[in-house]
Amino acid sequence: MTSAAPARHVLDPTGKDVYGEIERFRADGPMVRVEMPGGRPAWVVLGYAEAVELLKVRNRNPLVSKDIAHWADFVAGRVPEGWPLLMWAVKAGMFTADPPRHRDLRSWAAPAFTPRRIERLAPVIEQIVADRLDVMATAAAAADGRVMDLRAEFCLPVPIETIGALLGVPDDLAGTFLLGADALFDTAITPDVAQARFGALLGAIETMVDRKVADPGVDLTSDLVKTLGKKDAYTREVLLETVRLTIVAGYETTGNLIDQAVFALLTHPEHLAAVRAGEVSWDAVIDETLRWAGVAGNLPLRFAVKAFELGGAQIQAGDAILVSYVGTGRDPRKFDRPDAFDPTRATRDHLGFGHGTHYCLGAPLAVLEAKVALPALFDRYPGLRLAEDPGTIPANPGFITNGHARLPVHLGTTRA
């Protein structure tokens, strides 16, 4: 296995200018060779059509695999222990599995994400949102109208509390889960910090699973515990990874969706007015946010199982590949005025939840959370506005997801 194509660009681990970076990369085409943290080369897929082609289901003749054994650099020992993206590639579970194993693992967790089960979570989410809005109102009153970080107080708490309810996370472990999930997405922190937080997360998951074995409840973790061993693939190791993946996939990306939708509406008051007038649906806002912001960022990793040509690039067997959901959502060959936030656009096509075999299992839950959270927020705070110039609000550190480090707002008057 060889990987000879040189990297033409460096993928910024801080993610501070993701849109500008993507446009600089795009000048070289829809498939661009980049350098990841630690100097490891990879391809970034920027083109919508190229991403669809790469991600489509090919059970008999796949182009790419999630199995790290296909990565030339890893096999050759060029990826050090503690490399910040390694934890995205080495854990045994749905995220790193290929068919048919992926199908077995997905079916293990799938019953928790049926339309009926998601519908049952609606009142739970509504209560979480209402409670967060009450907490914000109390904090705003005590602070006498000072600036509030909406990301910290609302955008992230809603999904982490929802995932906690889905999994049955005990209150005493919630903080550890939060720090561990953050570490997975922050490509700017040191390997030592990332490893420590990730280790603490795995320890907390082990503790929770042990408690569910002793005293199962009505939650996804307990459902998985009850079916351990019913198939060869249903092992404790995979159970732990399934819980970790549910936390990771359901937390920051959904928080970014809410964050970016609020940001988009506050910076496009004409569209916010149309939503309030009933001329634009919240579904349209959510779909356009997923396209425009690409909240899943640059998602690692896939590996070429053979040489192939895609988007004018010659991919070699053993090459690493990331799909840029920011890039695919702003592909000018697919979308008219790709940089414009416009929930009235005719097409709602986006790859915000992936495509093909690894399409996000929790997509309906993420959409439901946003559909509950966004109208409740804007109804409670009709005068909500940004407290800083939009161009000065920093990006969340890391290139794996796309949100803000903070979302400073003035809440304005509260509607009872």
Positions of the model-derived regions?
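Cytochrome P450
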Residues: 1-416
